[in-house]
Amino acid sequence: MSDRIRVLLDGTPLLGSRTGVGRYTSALAEELASMSEVDMRAVAFTLRGWRKLRKVLPHGTRSRGMPVSARLLRRCWLRAPFPPIELFAGFTDVVHGTNFVLPPAVRAAGVLTIHDLAFLDSPGDLGPFDEHLPALVARSAERAAVVCTPTQAVADVVVERLRTPPDKVIVTPLGVDPAWFTARPPSEALRKRLGLPKEYLLFVGAAGPRKALDWLRKAHEATPDLPPLVLAGPGHARGDDRVRSTGYLPDVDLRSVVAGAAALVLPSRDEGFGLPVLEALACDVPVVCSDLPALREVTGGHATLVPFGDVEALGAALTGALAEPPSPATVAARRTHASSFTWRRTAELTVAAYRQALA
């Protein structure tokens, strides 16, 4: 084997609207494609639409789809390590499952990214397509030579809940795109198009039980002096004057909407990383979030942490975040902290995981 590592990356998260896993996969692919020690290809585990992968990958990256449906593949892989990925995509040194599931392989070393294990405690949150996800993730972790996690908090849960040996787990923190550090509040045209008020609190993320928006809504309703709440992401119902929804936003609009917020709030019941909190810190926006191990780790003392489910405490924290502008020293500290998370570092640690898997 040459020093250049042949990597087959699961690019399925790049298709459709990108939330957390899609943004991770996109940034990782961009960095890997620029590294001389990596020869990257991508595969999409979908029977339809996989050709769109070519349009969203870094220039010149080869890709292919699978001649069978993802649902059928998952059913097969749940029962046995067949069909192997080489049957469809040819030989490679490493196959990287970027989205919880690792395809079986005959010869390739397996690297698996587990973003969180929230579904183990709340299986009812899973959709019909993901009903077998807990078993698939457990099988994938057992099959993998290395498991990557975004935080040490998730690594600890993987070791405890999946009984994965600690020396098999590598923490590969996510990164903050440099564009966040120069983001500016939305223009009048963008405010008008999205229906943004002059002052607003912001939640960024897809709708779902894990995000605990019911807790946020209760705290917001119980504190009438707070500005309107804006929900940015897919799946949110239309609101009213006090709660507004933008739907899914492209990156350039999202950066402006975050930069213009009075504060960003992430009230999640569980998080593996919480990328929006770092992105908010990068553009000088105060952060209020649940007091969870991963969020404590990621925010590093630069956010207001609230006990999960405490309505009064959340309302008070949001009020406090708006009370007075941060000092220049506080702003500088937030930005310095956010700047320590780079996608290049994510890729370098991931390549280290590939080399460990091949050792």
Which ranges hold each PLM region?
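Carbohydrate transferase catalytic cores enriched for Leloir-type hexosyltransferases
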Residues: 1-359
